Regions:
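Extended hydrophobic/Leu-rich segments
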Residues: 7, 51, 60, 73-74, ...
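His-Asp-centered catalytic microenvironments across diverse enzyme cores
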Residues: 2-5, 12, 16-132
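Intrinsically disordered, low-complexity regions enriched in Ser/Pro/Gly/Gln/His and often acidic
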Residues: 10-12, 224
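Charged, long alpha-helical assembly modules
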Residues: 137-260
Length: 260
């Protein structure tokens, strides 16, 4: 058993899986020195033969209906044992292709662990997969939170632009539909932020606190926007003189501090 792992490739050719090892096919190491020598033994090998010399960490990539365990590989028991439950690797590959990156990593870690952690290489790979799943998950959470924050900020800027314009008694004059678009733009961004927040999965404790704070800010902004939408609806239904009088009822306030 090698002390170091290396990568190889798999390809589906005309509906059949084959494996290729460019590393071993390119030469060999002897006495600490690499000798370049082409070896076609490791070119386009069927999975049943390849498993004799190559054991993937994740048994899915054995591409066998009766995958062998790590202990069986150690013991040289590489023949297909059809008394085992059949593993539909083709179906599992389809599932794998449709999984998120995090789910792929978690499923792979589960298979690695199930197949026996019997040496340091396997242990390190399992540790890597679990850490990578956790890191990728957290990166997704942070990315989504930042995306929601950006949408919220855009909404607040648009809202405050509208309020500033309203407090100037809608001067210089714009068409009603253009004024409506100003508040709709703010509402759209706040709603976008709310939708993104709802999609954030399994955040850690510190990020959850930030999410709750942002959610409250979004709810407050939504209430203010609804109030302005109602005011604008009344404004549009009035005549010129009546519209002007609405600006003297009370001055509208800017809202919120955009998130950094």
């Amino acid at each position: 058993i090698d002390l170091l792992s290396h990568a190889w490739t798999a390809a589906n050719i005309d509906g059949k899986w084959f494996l290729f090892d460019p590393t071993w096919a390119s030469g060999y190491v002897s006495g600490g020195k690499f000798t370049k020598k082409l070896n076609n033994t490791f070119f386009k090998v069927n999975p049943e033969t390849f498993i004799k010399t190559h054991m993937p960490f994740d048994y899915l990539w054995q591409l066998l209906e009766y995958p062998i365990t790590n202990q069986e590989f150690y013991d040289g028991k590489i023949q297909q044992n059809k008394t085992k439950p059949k593993f539909n690797f083709k179906e599992e590959l389809t599932i794998y292709d449709n999984q998120t990156e995090v789910d792929q990593l978690r499923a792979s870690a589960a298979r690695v662990e199930k197949n026996g952690v019997i040496n340091a290489l396997i242990f390190d790979q399992l540790k890597y997969l679990k850490l990578q799943a956790e890191t990728t998950q957290q990166n997704i959470v942070v990315s989504k939170f930042n995306e929601a924050s950006a949408a919220y900020n855009d909404g607040i800027y648009a809202y405050n632009d509208f309020i500033n314009y309203r407090n100037k008694q809608f001067k210089p004059q714009l068409a009603d539909n253009t004024i409506q678009e100003m508040i709709d733009n703010a509402s759209g961004n706040i709603q976008k932020a709310k939708s993104i927040i709802a999609e954030i999965p399994n955040a850690d404790a510190s990020t959850t606190v930030l999410i709750k704070q942002l959610s409250r800010a979004i709810d407050d902004a939504s209430s203010n926007l609804a109030e302005q939408q109602d005011w604008l609806k009344i404004y549009f239904n009035k005549g010129k003189l009546a519209r002007k009088s609405m600006f003297f009822e009370r001055k509208a306030s800017l809202f919120g501090i955009p998130l950094n």
